[in-house]
Design a protein with these regions (language model features):
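Pre-Walker A (Motif I) flank of P-loop NTPase domains
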Residues: 31-35, 70
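Phosphate-binding/switch region of NTP-binding enzymes
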Residues: 21-24, 36-38, 42, 46-47, ...
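Short alpha-helical segments that sit at the start of domains
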Residues: 238-257
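Hydrophobic positions on the alpha1 helix immediately C-terminal to the Walker A/P-loop
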Residues: 48, 52
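Conserved phosphate/pyrophosphate-binding and hydrolysis machinery centered on Walker-type P-loop NTPases
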Residues: 143-147, 186, 247-248
Length: 257
């Protein structure tokens, strides 16, 4: 039995390769790659995702973070075009043509990747794809190894994001049990959160409150906690504070490097 040789590269050669720098859709927050935004049902994840899509399509800042103008595809798989229209009017009177919506799509291993790649071919300026929700594109089955299934599914989407140098954001749910580490509350196995480039958890301390914390962690971003407040009139999550900007204490600075 022949063994395939490892494809290695020495450190000196690696340092001499002029790789293209990482591109950010939202500066310091959402780079190219695969990302997961999780929150409890009806907490306001979709409002946040829609506003993010608008900001990216218009090239307007998301809170204090600059965005890179790009075309955006938002797969709203739990909504209708009528509901999306209503929400758009709540957010803006001038929605850009660079923001695209779909309410139906194939499942992950049954044509979804091909559908997205066809869209990217027709819209080469696309920088962000949002899938709302992750569960809608996954087949229902009784996997013997849920971790392997989660990791495999996420791997397909990560490969898509890396291949086209775009950001793909998956909207997902939290498990009901509380945990001191918000990332442990992401529904599913660690095969989901472990295979993504970034994870975001939107969490309220009490269900009826308008305030929440967005916990942000990833391979290419600093860990930060964004305190947010939902405005019931504008339907926008407003930024109250950013843990990376609060204090000049050495420990806080190191935490955000």
């Amino acid at each position: 039995m022949s063994i395939k040789k490892l494809n290695t590269i020495d450190a000196d050669t690696l340092q001499s390769i002029p790789y293209e720098p990482l591109s950010f859709v939202v500066e310091d927050l959402l780079p190219q790659g695969l990302h997961l935004l999780a929150g409890a049902p009806k907490i306001g994840k979709s409002w946040l995702a829609l506003w993010l899509c608008l900001c990216a399509a218009q090239g307007k800042p998301l809170w204090n973070f600059a965005t890179k103008p790009c075309e955006v595809l938002y797969l709203c798989l739990e909504d209708s075009f009528q509901r999306i229209q209503s929400r758009l009017f709540d957010l803006t009177e001038d929605a850009p043509p660079s923001l695209h919506f779909a309410v139906m799509a194939e499942q992950l291993h049954s044509g979804l990747v091909e559908q997205i790649e066809q869209f990217l071919q027709e819209h080469p300026a696309t920088g962000l794809v949002v899938i709302d929700t992750l569960q809608r594109i996954r087949a229902v089955g009784s996997e013997a190894n849920p971790y392997a299934s989660d990791y495999r599914d996420i791997g397909v989407l990560k490969a898509l994001a890396d291949r086209h140098r775009i950001a793909v954001l998956l909207i997902h749910h939290l498990r009901k049990l509380n945990d001191d580490d918000p990332m442990n509350m992401i529904s599913g196995t660690t095969g989901l959160s472990g295979a993504t480039d970034s994870n975001f958890v939107l969490r309220k301390s009490k269900r009826g409150e308008n305030t929440a914390t967005l916990y942000c962690t990833g391979r290419d971003i600093a860990y930060r906690e964004l305190s947010l407040e939902f405005n019931n009139e504008s339907h926008i999550w407003n930024l109250l504070s950013d843990s990376c900007e609060q204090t000049e204490q050495p420990n806080a600075r190191i935490r955000c490097v």
